[in-house]
């Protein structure tokens, strides 16, 4: 059956030429990101458990972790968590299959604790965290849906959106958090995983406001703190030059009051230890960013089952489509994908697959159009590839 | 101090002329909307309690309700909830003020139960719901921030977005849910508050897919069910003619299987009774819609304190600004507002207040620009009016 | 099959002649008693639900309610609960029977809330209490056990104990709480349901220490409070004369400090509102008392299923046996019953039914022995009568 | 001030001469014992934390752990926990002292997890357990009470009871559990910590019914299981000969059905993994036993603060007194101690310290009386020694 693919030319100021652009990324230790990470870790663990015990992924959605902040008393050279952070894993999972009972809650709990241990390296799981779990069973037996001999049908009437390529600012914001945590942190362990990078481009001026929960035990005193944030600033300024020729100003922890030594210190690297709650789906979209100048979906990508949940698959898929179109069709300036499902229809047959394309100046939209259609159609023909990539952990969801 | 207001002309296909447009609204009984509603009801109740006991609103944010679905056994003519829906109110609140202890948790609990009783009229609060509450104290004493003799300073570096006017599709989607619940429901009590209206405009064709959890006890049998959904369809089709001349097709509960009598029935009017979890900030934006063709903010508006939380105030404010610009500047076709705060700066002095305007064909952007600037500047001068409107319950947040 | 009934003469100073006797009763509003009451109310409601839906009582045990105290700010003439009391219903219940799903959690929740509303008349269930529920399924399907065509088999190797008659002090302590709450409270609503009556008999002197959480809203001021406790004292002194000719001294709220107005006030009538946690099985035994001069069982009677749970049935049964022996065999001074079950054996065939009897002076033990055996044997032959009395609510469990 | 010590002669059949005697011990892995152990571990950790941070023990009571059973699928050679056991630590603790905030919840959580890891060696804390914690603050600031320059005053009007010496049956029951777990288990790791030893002496015949949750992964098959329980039986029979010359019959897991291979297997060593809930204070008294032929107190000893909580101190103290009297006064056959406090009076001045003594045949009660009084008075003079022993972990509480 032919797919309903609609590629149209978008008449719009391309993002780089718009006057104001806003981009945000929450670091992996932000309470909302921790929630996303836990939700996705649990879903992946369930997928593996289901495959191992039942030969196929069974119905589940674990996209609702709630984090209730603790209390802490951070200090230079030490500090402690006073009241543990409470983390509640929430969702649905199939608990029985052909007479076999499945250890869904235990698997979820273990996966969550493992994820946290790997991600939040300064969190003491024995005393800083209460990990709770409420997994219900689903609304019905979707076993048939999950059979792999045909394309699954959509769980809902819902949509996903994606765009490409990243703007300069998007690249800077994304990589600032990534490089601070994967590169600079290796020699400056005081950098906390809870980070918020807010980028504002006003014409040709870029301002990066970084809020980073520094880890007290690695910092001797205020001087040391000032030196570190200064080094971070220089690091980010240098990093930005790889992505832009615009002026970039970097501001770190602007809420600090150095006179009163009231600075952004943490014990564990996340503000969830002290007053900041978190939940799934309220932070980064699946491309790793929050981009109010771009179309976005409200659907949480993390934690949903990767078999038939449109809120996950179509967000990931549209992002892959957009990136491939940009890669394979050089005349594309900006592309926006929107995929809309209809409940109970095969997921390779969306109600509409819409692409809006801004061609580069001087290029023909018609050529672009047909090439983009091919990319979209190919991806839809291979939609279950997204499922496999998710299970293998090859696609980020936040 | 002069404000940093940037009004630019946006070169873009106006929304009504884009080929594909998607708009969604989750009804007030959708698990995500219930979460939003509870969060906001709690915040309003705390505001009133603080004013009554302390003369001023104190620091709080209660924007993190988590709903864990129950289990139910719906039936024509009856049905019952088997396992109660678990609702966890989460957030921060000031519990002591000048030596007086405040009943924050009790106030929150009562407000939440009252809200639910009023909103979900078929839910039996004695047996269908477990209402739990975990309110911590905040990260620091923000009392100074909340003094009313000067403009509060921003709690965070964050942004809000808004647009106006509503497109035809936006109007249809929004009013479909509103009128079904406020008008048709008065004579057809079987309509559940949990509704999802998904609108797709493909050129001149509009498809409305409505998913509505019907309430079993008001429906005798399958025939009766079919008659009711048919009546709803006719009602919505007629309603749509008030907003558009385009073709409108309405689809209700397309997931139903009439042969097996497997239809979307509920006991209480919400799918939270059976398998659908919910949380704050994952549904409608503060204008009541999810609009992937429009800029959106990821910030949850519901439950945040209305004094200095940018994630609430700037989303509400930018929407008001956009609506007033459209009202006062007739040459404006579409306007998009983005307000970006800087932590610890007065909220009437955003880092940038950006407006992107598509003028109507044949009008002068320059005239529009200056008039829009006046509207924006006026609103910023009167920013605390938003606070007052929130406390009085005059602004919806979802 | 002949039953293993062992009646022996006990050579022991009868209770009334022992020098020191201690007796305690916790009022129905004591946090431990509330837990007991909730547990039993839930079990009764489940019994009724099972009978109504399945024709027979199914396996359940709900004997583990946990109460976590709230915070309150009591005052003369008013006061309020600041943080709700958290009550967690815990236990096991059969959730499915021959394909029918049963509303166990909803039934439990409703029963608990109803019980609380009736028992704690000054508690506002909308804001003073969070009622939570965690009912698992049992360790195995005990359906066969619950068939009514034969005597059920014991769920465990366990025992129950009972004695009769009540001593003077036991009568006084028991009736003090009962009459204060059922009689005096009707004209003095300030008496809280949370009461602890501690009786000490030292030879011929009886001291009753009563700790009673008075309800602030019914008391204007300290003078009024003093008058009320004085009236209570007089009331109890008069009451005691119905049971003893010994000297009785009554002390009420001896922890009060009248100079600092630091007295035992509550908002709701129970100290669970402020600092006193509670759980099942830690207060009164099933005869309503705690009696360290008498044999006791550690088994919680409340909340266990009345079909085959020895910890419930044998405690109730041995108390009934003891009372009937005293009633029917006038030569008995004191009798102590101990019933020991063996797991998986019919409950009318205890491993041993032991009676220790102190005959009245000058009477023949042999006559007493055979008459007591008959009472015991009769009760064992009609053991399921206990089950029926429990379900009908005719037997107290605390 | 002279103390109110009352030593009386008890005319009573000594325990060894009573016809029927019942004694029970719950093993350290029984759900009720785990609750006791967690509660006491938390209290000890808080004592140490308070001393380390504040120089003195501050007010706390953590005597209310609630265990909600999980689900498991035990097997010979393996098995797994399907749903984690939920453990809720409940109590009160001082969270602030002279401006210093104390990490009470974190300390509690860590202590609980450590205790569990050491006690339940086959429990995987990463996936088998959810450890939750709700510690409130107390009803008032008892700091003054806790000053060490004078004897603390009683927190309540309450009592403790103790007796000595152990009867033969008490010794057998107590040591059966102890030796199985500390000696035989070292070469038979399949013995689970969840054990219930029920002893019945009927005249000269002793029956020990042992219910022991065997650990599947150490047992190959049913034959192996049968061999092990047989070896346990022989071990206990031999052990009993050290304490009695009476006939002892040992029954292990009499609920097993060998034909259907339905035997008492566990994954973790405790039935809390599958259907058995638990809570503090419902199992062993502080002497390690449940003894319905002896006076008992209902007060939970575990988890209460060891400074002024009568429910803890007087139970431990009366047991120490009884044991010392037996040791130092050889003419004592049986001694029963009851200590009754009065709220707000120094704990070395009980309202009454009652001893009931059965002297050995042919000995003078008068001599015994005065010697016993000395022991009692000495202990009361040194009552705070109990506190120190508790903090140092030298006294068991269950």
Swiss-Prot record, chains A, B, C, D:
Gene3D superfamilies: 3.30.300.10, S-adenosylmethionine synthetase, C-terminal domain. Its cofactor is Mg(2+). Its EC number is 2.5.1.6. GO terms for molecular function: ATP binding; magnesium ion binding; methionine adenosyltransferase activity. One of its GO terms (biological process) is one-carbon metabolic process. It comes from the Archaea. It holds the Pfam family AdoMet_Synthase. Coiled coil: none annotated. It catalyses: L-methionine + ATP + H2O = S-adenosyl-L-methionine + phosphate + diphosphate. Keywords: ATP-binding, Magnesium, Nucleotide-binding, One-carbon metabolism, Transferase. ATP binds at residues 136-141. Belongs to the AdoMet synthase 2 family. Catalyzes the formation of S-adenosylmethionine from methionine and ATP. PANTHER family: S-ADENOSYLMETHIONINE SYNTHASE. HAMAP family: S_AdoMet_synth2. This is S-adenosylmethionine synthase. It comes from Methanosarcina acetivorans (strain ATCC 35395 / DSM 2834 / JCM 12185 / C2A). The gene is mat.
